[in-house]
Design a protein with these regions (language model features):
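Conserved short strand/loop->alpha-helix "switch" segment adjacent to the catalytic nucleotide/phosphoryl-transfer site
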Residues: 11, 29-61, 66-72
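ATP phosphate-binding glycine-rich loop and adjacent ATP-lid/helix-beta elements
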Residues: 99-125
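Glycine-rich/acidic phosphate-handling loop/turn and adjacent ATP-lid/helix
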Residues: 82, 86-108
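C-terminal end segment of the histidine kinase catalytic
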Residues: 134-142
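A conserved short beta-strand within the histidine kinase catalytic ATPase domain
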Residues: 73-81
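The cytosolic transmitter module of two-component sensor histidine kinases
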Residues: 6-17, 49, 53, 57, ...
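Glycine-rich nucleotide-binding loop
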Residues: 75, 86, 97, 126-133
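Short beta-to-alpha transition helix within the HATPase_c
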Residues: 1, 10-27
Length: 142
């Protein structure tokens, strides 16, 4: 859904994430799509960083689908907010909990992508559920 041209300098993350979630919801089915709630600030990010954030979000949503509710639909909240010079993306479920960062390919990929953003990611078991918070600068340090 992210179409780039030489003129694109920033991506509105509220629109990009909304479209990404819509596409993922379509592939996961209507019950999953209906269970996703969003709170998305219109934060503008340069395209390369937006793509990286989208990959992280996609992996977190897939993990919630697989582990939080045993493959069945359940509430999933996604927020993207501006926090001064930083953004904060939160993905929360109300599922089984306890599925913190693993050692599989998806977890390694997320760790690598977070490193590309020079950001941090925090997994918190909410018992029930899991909260994952990604935080990084809106603009990269040059």
């Amino acid at each position: 859904r992210l179409y780039l041209s030489d003129q694109v300098t920033t991506i509105d993350m509220s629109r990009y994430i909304g479209e990404l979630i819509g596409d993922l919801g379509s592939s996961m089915g209507p019950d999953w799509a209906a269970a996703i709630e969003t709170d998305l600030d219109p934060v503008c990010i340069e395209p390369g960083r937006a793509i990286t954030i989208g990959l992280i979000l996609t992996e977190l949503i897939i993990n919630a689908q697989k582990y939080a509710y045993g493959g069945k639909p359940g509430p999933l909240r996604i927020a993207f907010q501006e926090d001064g010079a930083f953004f904060r993306m939160t993905v929360e479920d109300e599922g089984a909990g306890g599925h913190l960062a693993g050692k599989g390919f998806g977890s390694m990929m997320i760790k690598s992508l977070v490193g590309q953003l020079d950001g941090t990611i925090d997994y918190r078991d909410r018992a029930p559920g899991l909260s994952v918070v990604l935080r990084s600068r809106i603009d990269p340090l040059v």
